[in-house]
Amino acid sequence: MIISPFKKQTARRYTHSVKIGSLFVGSEHSIKMQSMTTTPTSDVDATVAQICSLVEAKCDIARVTVQGVKEAQACEHIKERLLTMGLDIPLVADIHFFPQAAMHVADFVDKVRINPGNFVDKRNMFSGKTYTDKNYADSLLRLEEKFSPLVEKCKRLGKAMRIGVNHGSLSERIMQRYGDTIEGMVVSALEYIKVCENLGYRDVVFSMKSSNPKVMVAAYRQLAKDLDARGWHYPLHLGVTEAGMGMDGIIKSAVGIGTLLTEGLGDTIRCSLTGCPTEEIPVCESLLKHTTIYLNLPKQENPFALENSESFVNASKKITKTTPWGSVYGVFIKLHEHHILNTTAERLLEQLGINPTNGKKDATAPEGVVIPKSFLGTSIIEKLQKHMSVFHHHEVPCLYDYNEEIWNNEQVLSAPFVHCHATPPFIHSVRSFFSKRQCEDQPVKLVFSKDLDDEYEATVSIATEFGALLLDGLGEGVILDLPNIPLPTVREIAFGTLQSAGVRLVKTEYISCPGCGRTLFDLPEVTTRIRNKTKHLVGLKIAVMGCIVNGPGEMADADFGFVGSKTGMIDLYVKHTCVKAHIPMEDAEEELFRLLQEHGVWKDPE
């Protein structure tokens, strides 16, 4: 794993400027927000209308899917219509499998996005094919031959390009040599940029997406390191692919994108949420709001110099996760008077995820609560203590500073845990502390705390700031002080962040695409129905993908996949294998549930 090698004071990574239509991206320009249409690109009226709604939502760049020549020709009319309306928003064509479409559409759009996993090479079909050194070298020559014409055309026309690597759709050749690894993702990107460099074309943006924030963050960090080592300062487009719906999708996006933004990486961003494209923009705005703070901090020392990153990784592995509450990465919730007064013990237990009748805990029940000391000894708290740890405020120091003198304070050293208040430069200060102490013989249990009133802002802020540390294995848990947010929602934010950071698995995980012009069914509606019937299957990963073009690859490490194969038809997958094909849509959901039963993972809700 690549631990953040960037400075304690966040400075944007230097990237050269790339012109995309009428705007520029790069470190000298503001970070741009991007989204993608869900209408069929061939439906010019509908696509133009949706792009207009994106412009109204303050989207900076719009992307459309281009499956073939018909969609490429439609882009000419879409761009003309937008310009006639006075809307000069850059238009991006998304290409998979069809280089001819890329060549055709480059005449009409401002940027072409290609996927190295399927532009020239075959996508990985898990065939077991072996590539000799000669096979591999021949494939690189073929790549240069097939890719160079597009590079030369984009250079001649002044059009930009995105080399968009996706973890779930690496080519068969890359998978055979490097496996499903960060190295494979980076090599895949570098193979293509070398062709661009040789032809003197540098209007290129990179992306290294995955549906797993941990993988995504590591891939971007490694690519940035490798590019900078070569003196190549290409801009980065950040995104967690197929992040999903609602709060889960927001949290997953914030953990991945937010972490990198606080480190100074990223020149454009997109939150790939299942649903209406305009819903992605407020999440992007909130992410930029919460991470821009880190760009304005005073300069401090750099404990994360590249040459020290390996020793930090090794040190972080030595952290002994033993805690007073008997669980790794605990969740604590701060209770206020209004949580305890005017309610019953039974009702409070239910809100905290505990069945008051039999004491059975939901997977998202917190390890404990922190209460005002005056409520100790009350009947409601005594009942609560039978099911979880209860601490009062004075037992748990809250720190707003992180200097060495504080860490030698007897109250801090003797406390069951210490909650570090998340106020910038919180992320950098905690990393600096662990770096200096080398994570050895650490007597203080650090739990990260946050107090906010607004549910939306709390979700983005907590996922960003806590996720950035939890991804690297730092800290022992989180404590949330969100007095105006319902307790079940507080639990959802806390455990969603832990799961997205890859440190606890407490619920069913869904990989669902945001939809595009290739989508073959109502993604939000179908995804919601599947979620409602499977959300009790803790630990299972289910992918709901709109089409067969990207679906089988982008569902990555899902256990089961529900993928649109053609209009009105669904294919079902177990891992990467299609086990049931062309199922009528009206039968497909029940077939999925039957498949779960056949594989022994189904259980009835309790």
Swiss-Prot record:
Xref: Pfam families: GcpE
InterPro entries per record: Dihydropteroate_synth-like_sf, IspG_atypical, IspG_bac-typ, NO2/SO3_Rdtase_4Fe4S_sf
Record-listed [4Fe-4S] cluster binding positions: C513, C516, C547, E554
Keyword Iron: yes
Catalytically driven reaction(s): (2E)-4-hydroxy-3-methylbut-2-enyl diphosphate + oxidized [flavodoxin] + H2O + 2 H(+) = 2-C-methyl-D-erythritol 2,4-cyclic diphosphate + reduced [flavodoxin]
Enzyme Commission number(s) of this protein: 1.17.7.3
GO biological process annotation, one example: isopentenyl diphosphate biosynthetic process, methylerythritol 4-phosphate pathway
Nucleotide-binding listed as a keyword: no
UniProt cofactor(s): [4Fe-4S] cluster
Co-factor: note: Binds 1 [4Fe-4S] cluster.
Keywords tagged on the record: 4Fe-4S, Iron, Iron-sulfur, Isoprene biosynthesis, Metal-binding, Oxidoreductase
SUPFAM superfamilies per record: Nitrite and sulphite reductase 4Fe-4S domain-like
Source organism superkingdom: Bacteria
Entry GO MF terms: 4 iron, 4 sulfur cluster binding; 4-hydroxy-3-methylbut-2-en-1-yl diphosphate synthase activity (ferredoxin); 4-hydroxy-3-methylbut-2-enyl-diphosphate synthase activity (flavodoxin); iron ion binding
Pathway: Isoprenoid biosynthesis; isopentenyl diphosphate biosynthesis via DXP pathway; isopentenyl diphosphate from 1-deoxy-D-xylulose 5-phosphate: step 5/6
Family: Belongs to the IspG family.
Function: Converts 2C-methyl-D-erythritol 2,4-cyclodiphosphate (ME-2,4cPP) into 1-hydroxy-2-methyl-2-(E)-butenyl 4-diphosphate.
The protein's name in its UniProt record: 4-hydroxy-3-methylbut-2-en-1-yl diphosphate synthase (flavodoxin)
Gene assigned in the entry: ispG
